[in-house]
């Protein structure tokens, strides 16, 4: 093999092509406004937006956390308050039930909405593969701006500006997906005991191993399907 061909193959192996991302003047203007601040905050914590990003939501706290990979593990970057979600605790199962999903989701570049009726938005990927297997219905479930929603997670315009920009910049670096895990609460025994009478308890217990793996290793658990339920591995 010639040195030229070897060099070309090596460059293709080492460098991911940049994603073709949906964009708008609004999203560009937002990036100009908020990215310098976010970049300074990332650098101050020794983090790089080119590294993998992980998102997780806790409904009962109305909070979204953003974690960024640093070495082998992920490090907490910052959190954002959720202004509104509908339906309380418990996951979405059908279109029109007014519930906001709980589970393990994947966001890809194609799921960005740079110009939305809710300012900026990203589709969370509901229903996921397990939910499709169970026949759950509904679509267009978003994390978006404003402070009103049915089935989505409304972060305010100020909040979504930063969240959307971080996600966009991560995809711009060549990343192909971002994991979003949505929990009803922190899955410790205290909370599970508090909700022992809930009809959702079996489902929540099925989510707990994924939560526990991240708490132990600070590496997002990979959710697979086994016996019509979640199965986890790192």
Q: Language model features by range: what are they?
A:
Residues 1-3, 7-23:
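Bacterial Sec-dependent signal peptides at the C-terminal "C-region" and cleavage site
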Residues 18-150, 158-178, 187-234:
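Cell wall/extracellular polymer interaction/catalysis modules
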Residues 155:
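A conserved hydrophobic position in a structured secondary element of the catalytic/binding core
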């Amino acid at each position: 093999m010639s040195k030229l061909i070897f060099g070309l193959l090596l460059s293709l192996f080492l460098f991911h092509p940049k994603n073709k991302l949906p964009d708008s003047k609004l999203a560009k203007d937002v990036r100009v406004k908020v990215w310098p601040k976010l970049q300074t905050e990332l650098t101050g914590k020794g983090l790089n937006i080119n590294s993998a990003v992980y998102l997780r939501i806790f409904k009962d706290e109305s909070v979204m956390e953003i974690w960024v990979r640093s070495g082998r593990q992920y490090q907490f970057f910052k959190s954002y308050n959720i202004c509104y979600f509908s339906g309380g605790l418990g996951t979405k199962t059908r279109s029109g039930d007014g519930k906001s999903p709980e589970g393990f989701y994947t966001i890809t570049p194609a799921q960005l909405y740079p110009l939305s009726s809710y300012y900026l938005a990203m589709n969370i990927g509901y229903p996921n593969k397990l939910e499709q297997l169970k026949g759950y219905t509904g679509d267009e479930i978003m994390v978006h701006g404003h402070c009103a929603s049915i089935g989505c997670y409304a972060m305010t315009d100020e909040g979504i500006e930063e969240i959307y920009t971080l996600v966009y910049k991560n995809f711009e670096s060549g990343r192909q997906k971002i994991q979003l895990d949505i929990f009803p609460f922190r899955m410790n025994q205290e909370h599970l005991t508090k909700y022992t009478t809930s009809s959702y308890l079996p489902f929540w217990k099925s989510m707990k191993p994924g939560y526990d793996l991240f708490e132990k290793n600070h590496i997002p658990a990979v959710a697979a399907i086994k016996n019509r339920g979640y199965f986890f591995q790192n």
